[in-house]
């Protein structure tokens, strides 16, 4: 049997150990002012980490001055830890098996979630989702 998500969990753990034990700072990638929304939409629609580890891993974009791709983090860590204003995007599954995207918005230390509607074809990059992601990003810019 396949072990789905193992490689993503190993990558997250290795990065966390490098930060805590070796003092190696996380590589983050700056995003242009207009890149954050399309980047998050693409991640919701296609990121294998999010699809293999639904509601466990999230793509994080922070907004401490300028938008930065902070990479993949465990969702629980994003929700529980302090940090700069940011948006964490993940894909979740309800009890009936319906898949839907969720944005967790951290602003001034408080977290709230924006649950987006499901799409039967998982087209989370479509215009309706763009408006939702834009609204979340505006909260933290």
Regions found by a protein language model. Give the residues of each.
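Glycine-rich phosphate/pyrophosphate-binding loop and the adjoining helix
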Residues: 13
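Short FAD-binding loop at a beta-strand-to-alpha-helix junction that anchors the flavin cofactor
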Residues: 1
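Rossmann-like nucleotide/phosphate-binding core characteristic of flavoprotein oxidoreductases
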Residues: 4, 8, 16-141
């Amino acid at each position: 049997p396949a072990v789905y998500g193992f490689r993503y969990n190993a990558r997250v753990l290795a990065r966390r150990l490098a930060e805590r034990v070796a003092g190696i700072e996380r590589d983050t990638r700056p995003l242009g002012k207009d890149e954050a929304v399309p980047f998050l939409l693409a991640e919701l629609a296609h990121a294998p980490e999010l699809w293999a580890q639904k509601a466990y891993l999230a793509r994080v974009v922070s907004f401490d001055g300028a938008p930065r791709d902070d990479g993949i983090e465990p969702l629980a860590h994003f929700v529980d830890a302090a940090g700069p204003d940011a948006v964490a995007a993940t894909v979740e599954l309800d009890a009936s098996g319906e898949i839907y995207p969720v944005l967790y918005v951290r602003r001034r230390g408080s977290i709230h979630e924006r649950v987006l509607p499901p799409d039967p074809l998982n087209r989370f990059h479509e215009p309706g989702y763009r408006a939702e992601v834009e609204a979340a990003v505006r909260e933290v810019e």
